[in-house]
């Protein structure tokens, strides 16, 4: 790293002392890739996949392959992708949900490693109100249908404060299809809670899909 630093000689010496004294250490991509021609120095690239086949295949798969090729770690939100059973107007069919696409992403990480230095690294995020959340939480299990498993990537569940309140009160929680609640993913705090309650009322009235289950069992 020192050989590719720019600036005064004093700055280079100060940085070297930090490294030598083990008071500071750069991320793995920086250590691996400094002074190389193409590889990335950032630990992770964040992205969001929208609810369209174009976004899923281009942003969620193809572009991630290029970033992984040059040693970039990946972290992305897949909440906007509609859940299993959702109606697809363009084909008059039903969605298979987010899980099969995450399986593709997992295999892409295996196929395109980080510049041959280490395996691809990625993490997919899903919010707790998404209809596929239970299958999502099973993705890394060693049992079950391997076509619905992703052993080579990490998963993370975004949990809103409202879910914790419902859990503490032993109340119910409602799952939605993300294409029917398109703004929920962009809200947080009191704005999220207000909108979530509104969508629950719509689900009770049969205006949108809603699956109710205990917040804690």
Q: For each of these PLM feature ranges, what is it?
A:
Residues 4, 18, 66-67:
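Alpha-helical scaffold elements within enzyme catalytic domains, especially in hydrolases
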Residues 1-7, 11-12:
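Single conserved hydrophobic/aromatic residue that forms the stacking wall/gate
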Residues 8, 30-35, 44-53:
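Asp/Glu-centered strand-loop micro-motifs enriched in Gly/Pro and often flanked by an aromatic residue
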Residues 14, 20-43:
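N-terminal flexible segment immediately upstream of the FAD-binding catalytic core
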Residues 13-17, 186-188:
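Short secondary-structure boundary segments
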Residues 42-217:
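Active-site cavity-forming subdomains of large catalytic enzyme subunits
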Residues 6, 23-26, 72:
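Sequence-pattern detector for short linear motifs
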């Amino acid at each position: 790293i020192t050989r590719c630093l720019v600036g005064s000689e004093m700055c280079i010496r100060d940085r070297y002392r930090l490294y030598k004294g083990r008071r500071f250490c750069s991320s793995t991509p920086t250590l691996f890739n400094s002074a190389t021609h193409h590889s990335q120095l950032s630990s992770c690239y964040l992205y969001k996949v929208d609810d369209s086949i174009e976004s899923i295949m281009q942003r969620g798969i193809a572009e991630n392959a290029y970033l992984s090729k040059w040693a970039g770690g990946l972290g992305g939100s897949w909440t906007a992708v509609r859940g299993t059973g959702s109606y697809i107007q363009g084909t008059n069919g039903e969605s298979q949900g987010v899980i099969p696409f995450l399986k593709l992403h997992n295999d892409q990480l295996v196929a395109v490693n980080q510049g041959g230095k280490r395996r691809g690294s990625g993490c997919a995020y899903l919010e707790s109100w998404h209809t596929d959340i239970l299958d999502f939480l099973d993705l890394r299990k060693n049992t079950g249908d391997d076509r619905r498993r992703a052993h080579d990537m990490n998963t993370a569940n975004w949990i809103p404060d409202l879910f914790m309140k419902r859990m503490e009160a032993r109340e119910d929680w409602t799952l939605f299809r993300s294409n029917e609640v398109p703004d929920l993913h962009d809200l947080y705090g009191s704005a999220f809670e207000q909108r979530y309650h509104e969508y629950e009322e719509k689900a009770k009235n049969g205006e949108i899909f809603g699956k109710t289950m205990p917040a804690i069992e």
